Amino acid sequence: MAAVAVAVREESRSEMKTELSPRPGAAGRELTQEEKLQLRKEKKQQKKKRKEEKGADQEIGSAVSAAQRQDPIRELPGPGSQLGGTAGEKLPAGRSKAELRAERRAKQEAERALKQARKGEQGGVPPQACPSTAGETTSGVKRVPEHTPADDPTLLRRLLRKPDRQQVPTRKDYGSKVSLFSHLPQYSRQSSLTQYMSIPSSVIHPAMVRLGLQYSQGLISGSNARCIALLHALQQVIQDYTTPPSEELSRDLVNKLKPYISFLTQCRPMSASMCNAIKFLTKEVTGMSSSKREEEAKSELREALDRYVQEKIVLAAQAISRFASTKISDGDVILVYGCSSLVSRILQEARVEGRRFRVVVVDSRPRLEGRHMLHSLVRAGVPTSYLLIPAASYVLPEVSKVLLGAHALLANGSVMSRVGTAQLALVARAHNVPVLVCCETYKFCERVQTDAFVSNELDDPDDLQCKRGDQVALANWQSHPSLRLLNLVYDVTPPELVDLVITELGMIPCSSVPVVLRVKSSDQ
């Protein structure tokens, strides 16, 4: 390469000297003005020609270095050879940049095709016959795969190894599932998780067994209720815990809690509020000093859990109620959905303050949680109407605002709540009705989700059976192979459909959720 460049430069200098030498007949006399101008013009042309040749040398050098990086085993051209030519050829000085670039591109394409052919020979499959990646066709259009990775039997067996190692019973899927949600577990309340479980010999604490059964049977529902029940059960576990000899509480207690959490997950998937509470307890346990006595450490952990309930749930609800009451005016018609303990408290306290408003409770099958909200509001003396979600669009023209609860607030600002919330928010946006979401910050999670397909919860499909007297609709639905029931628990509402989020920190937009998460992580 260097020899080629030197040869080109020497040839250019010799041509320049030849052209700049005095012409015949010009020796012995002084050059005229025209001859001087002609000589200067020739010098400029030679200088321009040298610059072009220098640029061509640099491009050739970059091409050689690129070829070395792509195929270091390949033999580089010798001193007498030229890139892309046979030995003994010299680089023509009259080549333009475009021609050199085209030649270099053609050579790179040829080398790339040669490499692919070599790889095909080594793998035994020609490059044209190589199978495309999952979800991608030969035309380059990506398609959604028919089966998700969670459907893989190998992966399912791997996931079941963890409960087996922890001596935790597992539940089997029940019924046929809709293909879009085939990666989610679907359980039946008829099959008890503790049916073949021996309580005395089990590693699961009795308080956790009782709590798991209450979760699976739907006796405890709602994010706040489930989290409070979990923290109370953990207090009993800590109270009965004894540190083994030659062990530290900060390490052994965390290992003891792992099978308990796995058991609760088998009973019902954990909510975002429960996950945050477990993270808080784990942080408190691991940060416990080893010099403290066992009773003192256990007492501090129980007090920390009580403080967590008081600050994150009770006091947070009081602050949210104060902020939300400023948005309720006399004569308002407020639409609520389902039964949210926080929304119910806000409305009852606003009634106690003397606000005159009316509430429309929207409910949906199969849970019909709105009936509990209806009973609590009627007892508080709030004028209330009750209807099912298909009729919501008929009452929205007279509604002044929509007040909703939340299961979790995701990092991208999406609201995860009971299924049907996104539908109500969309209809409210069509009628220009503001949507207000009330949510404590301990329900904020760092998970990002834009739809309800990837991560969700499937409830018992038998709940969709409708009983009217002695007749049961959808009875023996499993005997029909083409029939599948979907009892979805949550949906995801995009942040564009939510006007305001009311928290104990104040009233914020959905776009401020990452800021709250960042502040919480820095405080911890």
From Swiss-Prot:
Modification type Phosphoserine: residues: S12
Positions of the region Disordered?
Answer: 1-155
Per the record, a Pfam family? IF-2B
Q: Which GO terms describe its biological process?
A: cytoplasmic translational initiation; myelination; oligodendrocyte development; ovarian follicle development; T cell receptor signaling pathway; translational initiation
Alphabetized InterPro entries for the sequence = IF-2B-related, IF_2B-like_C, NagB/RpiA_transferase-like
Q: Mind naming one GO cellular-component term on file for this protein?
A: eukaryotic translation initiation factor 2B complex
Q: Which residues carry this modification: Phosphothreonine?
A: T86
Q: According to the UniProt entry, which residue ranges have a biased composition of type Basic residues?
A: 41-51
Q: Which stretches does UniProt call biased (Basic and acidic residues)?
A: 8-20, 31-40, 96-121
Where, per the database record, does this protein carry N-acetylalanine?
A2
Q: Which PANTHER family match?
A: TRANSLATION INITIATION FACTOR EIF-2B, TRANSLATION INITIATION FACTOR EIF-2B SUBUNIT DELTA
Give the multimer and partner information. Answer: Component of the translation initiation factor 2B (eIF2B) complex which is a heterodecamer of two sets of five different subunits: alpha, beta, gamma, delta and epsilon. Subunits alpha, beta and delta comprise a regulatory subcomplex and subunits epsilon and gamma comprise a catalytic subcomplex. Within the complex, the hexameric regulatory complex resides at the center, with the two heterodimeric catalytic subcomplexes bound on opposite sides.
Q: What is this protein's name?
A: Translation initiation factor eIF2B subunit delta
